[in-house]
Design a protein with these regions (language model features):
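Histidine-anchored nucleotide/phosphate-binding helix
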Residues: 46-68, 278-289, 296
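Extended hydrophobic packing segments that form well-structured cores
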Residues: 6-7, 16-20, 355-419
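Long, charge-dense
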Residues: 69-122, 319-340
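Glycine-rich phosphate/diphosphate-binding loops that line cofactor/substrate pockets in enzymes
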Residues: 23-38, 61-65, 142-145, 214-215, ...
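Short glycine-rich or small-residue beta-strand-to-loop segments that form or flank ligand, phosphate
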Residues: 36-46, 69-75, 151, 264-268
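Short internal beta-strands
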Residues: 66-77, 294-300, 363-365
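Conserved, well-structured core segments that form the ligand-binding/active-site neighborhood
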Residues: 99, 103-260, 287
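C-terminal catalytic subdomain
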Residues: 273-363
């Protein structure tokens, strides 16, 4: 694709007709006739009308390409069932062909190929001296069965990389564990408060550098979601499309408030099926919780801490960053991506002379038993005792109710210079 194409709604969201017109125009410029195309898409933990784009890609490419397939950029999330995939893509009862859809498996070495290394010198430069190690770059080798890669994905503020989307759908979306664990821990060391909603971060630099080692044609459709629809869409290289999407995401997905809150009821939507994914309900709110305040993750539907990493989290629990950094020898056997998740959920705080003092009291109001919540070093509330109405419309009292948490970032007015 020679140059960026974009379409932003001046009203609420783009209509299906507008999206169809945009995709037709953008795809007309891409040389994929007779070629095999692999489309990399998010899983169901991201809000996006994938069913619309599944239909549009069929209409625009189905007759042009030799093969059209999809790869779900799961990172370390659990594989999706056939039924869940059909729901996400709107395939149940549809006359659209059932194109092949693959789940990425980060933990299956047979699925991965090493495509290079990020050198110790590069790591030292990018991290400002925080880290000094050679990092191998592995990616799902399925991509090399195809002639052209397309990324079809939303962009939101993100706790590890700053803003999601773009090359993040390669790393960690369809990558191996080494680079994933490395840059998640790098993000955790810099901290969620510093990274989230910041456009260019050291972690984004790692992601883009790793993606530069993929020697295949790549086209990215980066979009910004408003509600359940598409506010804007950008087509181009992964770097360029993401760059513009991140700017629009900063306008649409960051809510500024005057002063911090003492208590937040953060409601996790059903798309978050465990604390691993529902942790976003903390990440997006941490910047507006006062020191000593409380955040409640309200999710009666959640029964598990992490379907993938629960064993490790049961062992280490949730702690502030310095709890790990000051005794890393004790946690060398734990994947650093798990340590990163732990400290992101727990939030900022101190660990001095063996005493841990978090800045925020994070409480789970889920179907996870109290005993397990205490064991993993989080608070517990019985969700059945919570009257949601009692939290509504009390912002002037320092109490915030967030009915669908996890995608909108909250910041204080004095943080408006963070882009």
């Amino acid at each position: 694709m020679a140059m960026l194409k974009q379409k932003i709604s001046q009203q609420d969201n783009l209509s299906e007709e507008e999206l169809g017109g945009f995709m037709a125009e953008a795809l007309a410029d891409i040389d994929v006739s007779g070629k095999k195309v692999l489309v990399i898409i998010p899983d169901s933990t991201r809000t996006m009308p994938l069913h619309i784009f599944y239909r549009l890609l069929h209409e625009q490419l189905g007759h042009r390409v030799k093969e059209l397939s999809y790869l779900i950029a799961l990172g370390t999330h659990q594989p999706m069932s056939d039924e869940a995939i059909d729901r996400m893509l709107g395939r149940s009862g549809s006359e659209i062909p059932r194109y092949r859809v693959y789940n990425h498996r980060w933990d299956d070495p047979n699925q991965l190929r090493e495509i290079g290394w990020i050198s110790k010198a590069e790591v030292e430069k990018i991290s400002g001296g925080l880290f000094g190690e050679d990092v191998p770059v592995h990616i799902n080798k399925l991509i090399y069965d195809y002639d052209h890669l397309m990324v079809l994905a939303p962009t939101f503020p993100h706790e590890v990389v700053g803003f999601s989307g773009g090359n993040k759908y390669f790393f960690p979306g369809i990558s191996g564990p080494q680079i994933l664990n490395f840059f998640h821990w790098l993000g955790a060391v810099i901290t969620n408060r510093e990274v989230i909603g910041t456009k260019y971060t050291p972690i984004r630099e790692v992601v883009d550098l790793a993606a530069s080692k993929i020697d295949l044609p790549k086209t990215c459709f980066s979009m910004v979601i408003k509600g359940k629809g598409v506010k804007g869409i950008f087509a181009g290289s992964p770097e360029e499309a993401w760059d513009h999407a991140a700017d629009l995401s900063a306008q649409e997905h960051i809510r500024f408030v005057e002063k911090p809150f003492k208590e937040v009821l953060s409601v996790a939507p059903p798309m978050y099926e465990d604390v691993w994914t529902a942790g976003k309900c903390m990440y997006k709110l941490e910047p507006v919780i006062q020191k000593g305040g409380k955040l409640i993750i309200y999710a009666p539907h959640i029964t598990e801490v992490s379907y993938t990493h629960g064993k490790h989290i049961d062992e280490i629990g949730y702690h502030v960053r310095d709890y790990f950094m000051k005794q890393m020898d004790k946690f060398g056997h734990i994947p650093r991506g798990v340590l990163a998740h732990s400290t992101h959920v727990k939030g900022s705080g101190t660990y001095e002379n063996g005493v841990e003092i978090p800045n925020v009291d994070v409480v789970l109001a889920t179907s996870i038993p109290e005993e397990r919540c205490r064991k993993i070093n989080l608070g517990y509330m019985d969700p059945g005792t919570i009257d949601i109405d009692a939290y509504r419309d009390r912002e002037q009292e320092g109490i915030l109710y967030v009915p669908k948490a996890g995608e909108i970032l909250y910041r204080l007015n004095d943080q408006k210079t963070g882009q």
